[in-house]
Design a protein with these regions (language model features):
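Residues immediately within or flanking Cys/His clusters that coordinate Zn2+
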Residues: 26, 85, 90, 136, ...
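Hydrophobic "anchor" residues
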Residues: 43-44
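Conserved alpha-helical substructure of the radical SAM core
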Residues: 56, 95-165
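Short, small/polar residue-rich loop motifs at catalytic or cofactor-binding pockets
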Residues: 29-32
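A short, well-structured catalytic beta-strand-centered motif of the EAL phosphodiesterase domain
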Residues: 47-48, 150
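C-terminal accessory region of radical SAM enzymes
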Residues: 2-24, 49-96
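Short, ordered coil/turn segments that flank beta-strands lining enzyme active or ligand-binding pockets
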Residues: 39-40
């Protein structure tokens, strides 16, 4: 039997919590259309694994273009375009949790979007993209955030290979 990961435990705890699950209809998140995150194992995601635990592929084994427009990547983008956000953990994603305030700039009401490129994506229901705007390389396990979705304090590498390099 496989031991559940910390991520599995957190997602189960959150699922059973009183954190509100907001309706995402009428909102658009640009993250899957503009952002990639690559961890030390080469796994690629569009955002934090605690917010969406779905990999698009692995750049160690797959061509970048294939990861960028993998079936999973396109399905995630489709779920944003149809308003379901079905791949997102609506209880851990701080962008979705910002809905009562009208979004956070990355997640916006569709009628508030001014970026023409994003408006074209929405209008044409584009799930394939030609390029990415931001790439975040997650080369070490340190984090300067005290994010309630995954930790209550900072994680700092103070010894070992990650610290020395």
């Amino acid at each position: 039997m496989n031991k559940p990961s910390n991520l599995d435990n957190i997602n189960e705890d959150v699922t059973n919590s009183d954190i509100p699950d907001f309706d995402t209809a009428g909102f658009f998140c640009s993250q899957p259309f503009t952002n990639l995150e690559v961890n030390t194992r080469g796994e690629v995601r569009t955002c934090c694994a605690y917010w969406m635990n779905q990999t698009l592929g692995n750049i160690t084994f797959d061509e970048t273009e294939n990861v960028l427009n993998s079936d999973t990547a396109q399905d995630i983008r489709k779920s944003i375009l149809d308003g379901s956000f079905s791949y997102c953990n609506k209880k851990t994603c701080p962008r979705i949790q910002s809905i009562p305030k009208g979004g956070d700039g990355i997640l916006q009401r569709i009628e508030d979007i001014e970026d023409q490129h994003l408006l074209d994506i929405i209008k044409n229901k584009e799930t394939k993209i030609d390029s990415i705007k931001y790439v975040n390389f997650l080369w070490d396990l340190s984090c300067n955030l005290r994010c309630p979705s995954c930790r209550v304090s900072t994680i700092l590498n103070t010894k070992g290979e990650a610290y020395e390099n």
